Amino acid sequence: MNIRPLHDRVIIKRQESESKSAGGIVLTGSAAGKSTRGTVLAVGNGRILDNGSVKSLDVKVGDVVIFNEGYGAKTEKMDHEEVLILTESDILAIVEE
């Protein structure tokens, strides 16, 4: 199945979170938590402004981002993997290495 996001929505594949604490203790289950980093898989055409023009998104496919998994985030299955669909405003930063 292929999912194409609309407008200012972005599809993100969550990165695996580190399963060790700062002290080196291995965390399991819910103690490990969910990562708020992910890779952008697809982006919509852009946000529609009040004047009707379309502002393209700042993120692009392949970007690694830090996001806020807020109430608007939607979890879906795509090619047997869990992905998140959220708006660009839920993305807090682009990770540059």
Curated annotation (Swiss-Prot):
**Keywords of this entry:** Chaperone, Cytoplasm
Q: Name one Pfam family in it.
A: Cpn10
So what does this one do?
Answer: Together with the chaperonin GroEL, plays an essential role in assisting protein folding. The GroEL-GroES system forms a nano-cage that allows encapsulation of the non-native substrate proteins and provides a physical environment optimized to promote and accelerate protein folding. GroES binds to the apical surface of the GroEL ring, thereby capping the opening of the GroEL channel.
Q: What is this protein called?
A: Co-chaperonin GroES
* Cell compartment(s), UniProt: Cytoplasm
User: Per the record's keyword annotation, is Cell inner membrane included, yes or no?
Assistant: no
What is the name of the gene encoding this protein?
Answer: groES
Q: Which GO terms describe its biological process?
A: chaperone cofactor-dependent protein refolding
Cellular component per GO? cytoplasm
Taxonomy-wise, where does this protein's organism fall, top ranks first?
Bacteria, Pseudomonadati, Pseudomonadota, Gammaproteobacteria, Enterobacterales
Q: By its UniProt entry, which PANTHER family does this protein fall under?
A: 10 KDA HEAT SHOCK PROTEIN, CO-CHAPERONIN GROES
Q: Which GO terms describe its molecular function?
A: ATP binding; metal ion binding; protein folding chaperone; protein-folding chaperone binding; unfolded protein binding
Q: Which family does it belong to?
A: Belongs to the GroES chaperonin family.
Q: How does it assemble?
A: Heptamer of 7 subunits arranged in a ring. Interacts with the chaperonin GroEL.
Q: Gene3D superfamilies, per this entry? A: GroES chaperonin (2.30.33.40)
